[in-house]
Structure formats: C-alpha cells, structure tokens
Amino acid sequence: MNVKLIRIIVGAVLLAVAALVEHTVQLPVWQMLIIYLVPYMVVGYDVVGEAFEGICHGEVFDEDFLMFVATVGAMCIGFLPVAEPQFAEAVFVMLFFQMGELFEHYAEHRSRRSIRALMDIRPDTANVLRDGKIQTVSPDTIAVGETIIVKPGERVALDGEIVDGTSALNTVALTGESMPRDVHKGDQVVSGCVNISGVLTVKVQKSFGESTASKIISMVENASEKKSKSEAFITRFARVYTPIVVIVALVLAFVPPMFCGGYVEALTTWLYRALTFLVVSCPCALVISIPLSFFGGIGGASRHGILIKGASYIDALSELDTVVFDKTGTLTHGEFCVEAIHPDKISPDHLLHLAAHVERYSTHPIAVSLKQAFGNEADGCMVEDVEEIAGHGVRAVVNGHTVCVGNERMMDSVGAEWHKCHVVGTTVHVSIDGEYAGHIVVADRIKEDAADAIAGLHAMGISNTVMLTGDRKEVGEDVARRVGIDDCHTQLLPADKLGILEQLLDKKKKNRTLAFVGDGINDAPALARADVGVAMGALGSDAAIEAADVVLMDDKPSKMVTAIRIARRTLGIARQNVWFAIGVKVLVLLLAAVGLATMWMAVFADVGVMVLAVLNAMRTLRLSSD
C-alpha cells in the first residue's frame, strides 16, 4: 500500500482520538497542542520539510509554504486572548491537502500508465537465429545483421528486411489504422507491428535503441519537456500570484483590526480569515491539471498514429490559419498509374499490350505503371532488339513489328503524326512500323482521402490551403482543382519552395500559425521553417521523425484534420480547467475575506477544484478522431 495513504489513514485515526480527548478531558491549551501535533506531523511532516527547504533555497512562495503557514497559524491562533483553539481544523486542512496530493499522484501515474499501455509496442523478447538454432533473447542483445524469426501473433522487435516468408502485419499501434498490411520477401518491416499470419524471417537493420518503436516511445515520453503557452503562463502566474496572496493575507490579518474597537479581539477574527484566505489561494488545481491536459492530449494523439513532439505544438496546431502541402507523396501517392488509353486504329488492350511489352525491361516509373496496368506479360509475345533512346523513349521489335514508345520527339524521329491529349498528365505515344497507334496518359495517383482532408480543413475554419510542386503548371493545377486546394505554386525547385513558404509566413494573420506538410524526405528545410512541420507517412523514416514537429505515421492526409481536432479539444479542456479553477477560487477568496467561508470550506474548495480539474484533464487521453 502507498506510504502516503498509510500516513493519511493513521493520521485520520489519530485526529479522531485527539478530538475525542479534547471533548472528554479538560486539558490546558499547550497540552492539547502537543496531542494534535502528533497527527499533524504524521500527516504533514513532508509538507513542513518541503516548506523549510524552499525557504532555505529562496523559493518561499509555493503550495507547501501556503499550507504550512495556514495550518501553523491555525494551531497558534488558540493562544490569543478570547480566541478558540483551531487545532482540529489545522490538522484536518493538512489531511485534506495530502489527500488531494495523493489523488494528483494517482491521476498522473494513471495517465502515464495509460500512455505506456497504449505505446506498449516493444516486446520483451525476440527469437534470434544463431548457429542454426532459434534462441529467445532480449531484443537489446541482438546486433544489426542478425536474423530474427517472427511467428504469428508476435510483435516485430526490431526494424529490418524480410528475407523469407509472407504475412500480413497489424500496424494499428503505429498508424492508428486497423487494416492489415500485406508483406513478403524484400519488404521492410518496422518494430511495433504485430505479425498476423505467416512466419517471417527478418534481417535486422537497426539496433533496439534505434528502432522505430523505441524512438516513438521516447518521443511521446519526452514531449512534456516542450511546454505550451498555457503551461508557461501558469508557471509565471504561480510565481507572481503566490507572493501577492501572502501579502494580501498579511494585510487582511493586521490592517482591518486597526479600525475596530478592540484590536486583540478583532485580530483573532481577521487572522482566521487571513489563514482561510491562504488555504483557498493554493494554485494546485492550475499547476497540476494544465500540464496533465497537454500530456494526455499527446498520449491520446499517439493512439491515432499522430506523434506530437511537445505541448507547444498543440498550441500551434490549434491556431492554424494556413496549411501548405507538398504534392508528391503527400496529396498524391508519388507513383504513376494509367489514367487514360486513347488508341488510334487498334484496340485499347492491344495498345497497352504493346507499350507494356516494349517497356518490360525498363525500371523507369512510367514503365512500371504501364506493366502494372497490363498485368500479364506471360503471353508468348516475342520481344527483340530492345533499345532505350535517351530523352526519347524505347524502341523494340514485337512479333516482327517495330514498336516505338516515348514522347513527341520519338514520334517525330520515326515520322509518326501524333495527336495532343486533353487529359492532364504525362502522355506516352506509341507507333507501329512508323504509323501512329495512339497514346497512353499516366499521372501521379491522388490519394483517396486527399479531397476529404482539404474539405475537412476548410470546415474547421482554416482559410488558406496551398500546394507546392515541381510539376508542370497544368499537372499541378489539375491536382489542386481535384482536391480543392485554394492556391497552387508549380514548377518549383527545392529552394523556391522555401521562398514561397517565407512569403506565406509574412502574409499570415497575427497570432495564427502556418503548417507545412511533407513526406519528410526532401522537405527538411521547409519542415524546420514552418510554425509546425508535419511529416506524413513517416513509418520507418528516421529523417522525418527527426525533422518534424508532428509526425503522421501513415500516408493519409486526413490525419492532419484529426491532429488539429485533437489539439483544439486538448486546448479547450485546459482552458476549461483554468477558468473553472480561477472562478471558484476568486469566489471563495471573496467569501473568506468577508468572513463567510470557514477553513473547512476553503480546503474543500481547494481540494475539490483540484480533483475535478484533474478528472477533466484525464479526458484528453480518450479524445476521438471524430
């Protein structure tokens, strides 16, 4: 059982015994003081020690000092003429203060435990293949280059490449998505995924400490070091607020009695009010609940595959006015696919068949898209004399016919009269024996949720969405139009993108922020320059995790909407706590100043407000994406 809880229980029993003695035996005041000091010290010796330590180090004004002064003052008030002893009240105040502290520690521990459970993605053991035998060892003892075996139902312990086996991986702990990902030999796997079906043999590429799972856990746990504006405000507020409260309490204790008939009698009344004032003025609810709100928000976001590197970025996300997207790999897949087939005198299937066979040995992205669209090359077709002509295309003999696949220059070189295409994309022309046979349009495939993501941002009041791309003007503008982007800048070099970003930062509204969303590979300068740098699709990408302020672990632009929604709700809960705590405290402080609040009421108000604020803060752990 918790030591503090035992002290509280023992202190409560001793307080009851002391109260019983006080009401059954007539003892001098100093003897009753000694009796009540026993439960007081059992319950509050650490508070007294912290108060004295703070005084010795020059850090006088904190909650321990306020409680020490208020309770010792209540103990001593009974020695004033015509004053009633307040021993029981003093011990009870300390008892309740410690109960509040206990609840605070419990709530924080539970929050951290919940986050650790959510991020429990590192297995304690792994199966490593050594000397032809499978050994179960701790993952941190496995070196780069060794081979591990991942059985169905087990979690991948280290990042690596599959050298044997086929399976499906559950990546929900990393990406927040429940759809399994199919993997086979040659694919990369990252630690934290759960193997669903087949046995996988994986060659380790990163040590345990450098694995994706370890970096994610470290990032979430260290996120609290970067304080939000609200946290920084509360820290400054407490430093100024507490000394002011002590000064007001001193004035309240000693100035009003000067204007009363009997100074000593009035001093007793006003001193009690001042001590009550001190008890209720303790800023625990604010100091505890605000950081807990942001910590919970960061943990809650991690459940959805969103890693926020600090509470300050929750502030920045909630104040976004402009979101800038890189096109390739962010709004589009970065992979070509066939958009249209326009044959001339032959069938569409035959046109695609010829293009795919001519390009069958090429690794160019356009060639890959043609082969994927055709799907089946094992049809007995004879392909000979394949020649790649730089800057033009590929020429080959297919079943005795010379087939050219390439751009307009290729068609001009063989005398084929080609046609322009109205479909936006890269046009691949085809000729057969010098006669034009048609063209195929390939384009970078837009992500399925890109349009929904932009619509979601607009619905949240983000007034400016911008896309940056190095693509041709017509290609970039077509993508922007299809997804609903407000502004598009095309034909940009990497250095140009940073210049555009600087212009947008200069134009943004005051007290609003700008986010840049990229794939984290070539966007490090832009990610660093934006108010919030967001790396998308960073599963297994060290560069993205290091460079960005916010990391979206999968490839869905809609996760940006989720990140902003969670940030705004987290900030809303933190603000609720601020206004609730300040409102209740101001009310009870006023009641204490005019003598309408007792010390019992004050401690109930202080601890009660803290408990409610902490419970409200813990809601951030379960924020949904909707």
PLM segments and residue spans:
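N-terminal membrane topogenic signal
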Residues: 1-12, 241
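Bilayer-spanning, highly hydrophobic alpha-helical transmembrane segments
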Residues: 12-13, 232-261, 274-294, 575-604
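Actuator/coupling domain of P-type ATPases
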Residues: 19-22, 36-125, 129, 141-148, ...
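Juxtamembrane helix-loop transition segments at the membrane interface in multi-pass membrane proteins
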Residues: 52-61, 103-117, 292-311, 618-626
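Conserved catalytic phosphorylation-site environment of P-type ATPases
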Residues: 63-68, 174, 272, 282-358, ...
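P-type ATPase nucleotide-binding
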Residues: 338-464, 473, 482-501
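Conserved ATP-binding TGD loop and adjacent catalytic N/P-domain core of P-type ATPases
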Residues: 400, 432-576
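Membrane-embedded transport module
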Residues: 508-511, 548, 553-626
